[in-house]
Swiss-Prot record:
A ubiquinone binds at residue 201. It is found in: Mitochondrion inner membrane. Keywords: Electron transport, Heme, Iron, Membrane, Metal-binding, Mitochondrion, Mitochondrion inner membrane, Respiratory chain, Transmembrane, Transmembrane helix, Transport, Ubiquinone. InterPro entries: Cyt_b/b6_C, Cyt_b/b6_C_sf, Cyt_b/b6_N, Cytb/b6-like_sf, Cytochrome_b, Cytochrome_b_C_euk/bac, Cytochrome_b_N_euk/bac, Di-haem_cyt_TM. This is Cytochrome b. The cytochrome bc1 complex contains 11 subunits: 3 respiratory subunits (MT-CYB, CYC1 and UQCRFS1), 2 core proteins (UQCRC1 and UQCRC2) and 6 low-molecular weight proteins (UQCRH/QCR6, UQCRB/QCR7, UQCRQ/QCR8, UQCR10/QCR9, UQCR11/QCR10 and a cleavage product of UQCRFS1). This cytochrome bc1 complex then forms a dimer. It comes from Neophascogale lorentzii (Long-clawed marsupial mouse). Its cofactor is heme b. Belongs to the cytochrome b family. The gene is MT-CYB.
Length: 381
């Protein structure tokens, strides 16, 4: 009998994507993050669905409904803690996934890369609107500060901000629409992730060496299903450790106070995964300039394929580029730290220097390093 998984219209797609998929034999653990992101998305959709059954998107009851979930709903505390910390795990995997793509030159699969950048932006938007929903102090003021950035757009800015708010400030209408956005966006992310995979399977996976792996491929199952399962166990271990032992470690204490438009918290800051972009935004003493820098800090990923000057795809055998890559990593960690600090010296100047270095590394130093490595590899006789 002909194998059903190879003939059935639906099973055939799954078979070509996850079972009989020819995969390079040398891809390392850095290639696990795609599947981990898929798992994170499923966890977030499921926990979010059950939270939405008990949540009310009204300014008067939103905060108390979240408290009710944690106190009165069966395992509601667990759902909330998994959902909140699941977002942190999602972004951790995202940053490592993007970093892997930059290090090994995966961005040369341009369609896959561009869809990936759109996915990153969509996930960031989802996390932002989701953070507003508990309607704590930091939820409210975070929403106020970030949506206010729209007003920096010349001519149409104020109209745009008020249109976004559904009034003259962040209020009931804003909360209701943010809940609607937060519910629909994960499904858009799922659709985009499928397109991301579709483009990836047009070319096949890249590999650490950066050379064409067609001569040496193995089936995805059982080799990489078992390898992904190990990554999954580690992900769940970290998520459960966070959610069960220290659920509020990555949150902000201000969010335990209900939103109060008359009382501004001393330090308005977003969740840790936005701090690098927030630091870049704050490092420019001009509203519009800051907004443009904020956008550029993410959208710069779209032009990385155009800035590839090296003759080799991967950084595996390029020590100068490797050094710059790790400087970039350290720089992003520095920006994340600065984003969580108050706006005072020496943090202001450190943030400005780190922001300048971020753009300098990506736009100038890394392309130059590629050219230099090409020159060094040329035979000199």
């Amino acid at each position: 009998m002909i194998n059903l998984r190879k003939t059935h219209p639906l099973l055939k797609i799954i078979n070509h994507s996850f079972i009989d998929l020819p995969t390079p034999s040398n891809i390392s653990a850095w290639w696990n993050f795609g599947s981990l992101l898929g798992v994170c998305l499923i966890i977030q959709i499921l926990t979010g669905l059950f939270l939405a059954m008990h949540y009310t998107s009204d300014t008067l009851t939103a905060f108390t409904s979240v408290a009710h979930i944690c106190r009165d709903v069966n395992h509601g505390w667990l759902l909330r803690n998994l959902h909140a910390n699941g977002a942190s795990m999602f972004f951790m995997c995202l940053f490592l996934h993007v970093g892997r793509g930059i290090y090994y030159g995966s961005y040369l699969y341009k369609e896959t890369w561009n869809i990936g950048v759109i996915l990153l932006l969509t996930v960031m938007a989802t996390a932002f609107v989701g953070y507003v929903l508990p309607w704590g102090q930091m939820s409210f003021w975070g929403a106020t500060v970030i949506t206010n950035l729209l007003s920096a757009i010349p001519y149409i800015g104020t109209t745009l901000a008020e249109w976004m708010w559904g009034g003259f400030a962040v209020d009931k209408a804003t909360l209701t629409r943010f809940f609607a956005f937060h519910f629909i966006l994960p499904f858009i992310i799922t659709a985009l992730a499928i397109v991301h995979l579709l483009f990836l399977h047009e070319t096949g996976s890249n590999n650490p060496s950066g050379i064409n792996p067609d001569a040496d491929k193995i089936p995805f199952h059982p080799y990489y299903t078992i390898k992904d399962a190990l990554g999954l166990m580690l992900l769940l271990l970290v998520l459960l450790l966070l959610a069960l032992f220290s659920p509020d470690l990555l949150g902000d204490p201000d969010n335990f106070s209900p939103a109060n438009p008359l009382n501004t918290p001393p330090h308005i800051k977003p969740e840790w995964y936005f701090l690098f972009a927030y630091a870049i935004l704050r490092s420019i003493p001009n509203k519009l300039g800051g907004v443009l820098a904020l956008l550029a800090s993410i959208l710069i990923l779209l032009i990385i394929p155009l800035l590839h000057t090296a003759n080799q795809r991967s950084m595996m055998f390029r020590p100068i580029s490797q050094t710059l890559f790790w400087i970039l990593t350290a720089n992003l960690i520095t920006l994340t730290w600065i984003g969580g600090q108050p706006v005072e010296q020496p943090f202001i100047i450190i943030g400005q220097l780190a922001s300048m270095l971020y753009f300098l590394l990506i736009l100038v130093l890394m392309p130059l390093a590629g050219l230099l490595e090409n020159y060094m590899l040329k035979p000199k006789w």
